[in-house]
Amino acid sequence: MALSREETARRYGTAIFDFAKDSGKTELMYSELTELKKAVQAEPRFVQVLSNPVLDAKQKKSLLTAVEQGFSAELQEVLNFLLSYDRFDNLVDIIDYYIHLYNAANHIGTGVAKTALKPDEDQLQRLADSYAKKYGLQALHLENEVDPEIIGGVVLEVEGRVIDGSVKHRLEKIRAMLTK
């Protein structure tokens, strides 16, 4: 029975995290995998080629060798391992799971800040720092999503928790109080 994408990502992501932890390279692996993920998302054909069943293992290995130059020996070993088990079609999911494990181990949160207008990086960072401090996180990585419907303020969605500080939400609360 074939594994689901989620189960494959969980198993391989966990194995890579354990390997990095045992070699004392979790931070380096995090950094390199994040860089690799960005590159793969910018050029998805890379994964398609290395997942192509028409190419033989030798051709795939030579392509991978050309790409993995500049990465650590540990990441090269991981990439060769994934290639040998034909798991390159799950590469981004596996990286995402590794990042999830890394963030959990280091008390780093991730989330989305919905705003009516795009904030500058400094504002977003201050918001992230404030939330991280309040909820006992070492750091918080926030992505911004612009949603003019909220009128003003911010809606934070972090690790399953939603804090709605939008003007729209406040107006809805006032409307509800007035209609009682």
From Swiss-Prot:
InterPro entries: ATP_synth_OSCP/delta_N_sf, ATPase_OSCP/d_CS, ATPase_OSCP/dsu. It is a peripheral membrane protein. It is found in: Cell membrane. Its main location: membrane. The keyword rRNA processing does not apply. Keywords: ATP synthesis, Cell membrane, CF(1), Hydrogen ion transport, Ion transport, Membrane, Transport. The keyword Ion transport applies. GO terms for cellular component: plasma membrane; proton-transporting ATP synthase complex. Pfam families: OSCP. One of its GO terms (molecular function) is proton-transporting ATP synthase activity, rotational mechanism. F-type ATPases have 2 components, F(1) - the catalytic core - and F(0) - the membrane proton channel. F(1) has five subunits: alpha(3), beta(3), gamma(1), delta(1), epsilon(1). F(0) has three main subunits: a(1), b(2) and c(10-14). The alpha and beta chains form an alternating ring which encloses part of the gamma chain. F(1) is attached to F(0) by a central stalk formed by the gamma and epsilon chains, while a peripheral stalk is formed by the delta and b chains. Belongs to the ATPase delta chain family. F(1)F(0) ATP synthase produces ATP from ADP in the presence of a proton or sodium gradient. F-type ATPases consist of two structural domains, F(1) containing the extramembraneous catalytic core and F(0) containing the membrane proton channel, linked together by a central stalk and a peripheral stalk. During catalysis, ATP synthesis in the catalytic domain of F(1) is coupled via a rotary mechanism of the central stalk subunits to proton translocation. This is ATP synthase subunit delta.
